[in-house]
């Protein structure tokens, strides 16, 4: 509050923060009201596992505006996607089963992902929705972006679900088997949130939302969404 209070004292500036358990919409609105400044809460991304979260952020922001307070929910016009190989699989790191792998060397890592008990715990985590998780086991949204071995290039461009069906395997087994076979160098692309375009369109059209959310370079190891302006014009304006 002291930080945002400076904006109120100076009568200029905006405040933006990624919200969490301690930063509710009520708190964010009070910051806007107390300092008469625009406040942006991030990020209202549609998540199939928690379908009410993003719409509520947008609706709450619109209601705050109706009360005369400058609160907006930042939304994105494109899916949140990440590229990763297993040793740096950020989408999986929130899973309890993944904890032993975070600082493991490649040899230990590969041995672990081949272990049947590890795969059992991994499946269990995927089937247990909880806040903070990015991936919930929808293998139709994880694609093989780059295979290392020539004999595996046929899988590039396929989702893990499609690859598993072609191999007659469970998707979890297909996912780990390919990476283990390729020395953990296989690169995947995962569509994590905001991939349901019908729901994304609703968020963008609400008065409480602001199409402004992108990642212009803070996490280049995983993603770069800096082209969201062109995606907005090319996909949503021209194509949709």
Residue ranges and their predicted role:
Residues 16, 211-212, 235:
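Structural recognition of the beta-strand scaffold that forms the well-ordered cores
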Residues 7-8, 23, 29-214, 219, ...:
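Polyanionic/metal-chelating signatures
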Residues 216, 223-224, 229, 234-240:
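Generic long, charged, amphipathic alpha-helical segments
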Residues 1-5, 12-22:
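Divalent metal-binding pocket/active-site signature
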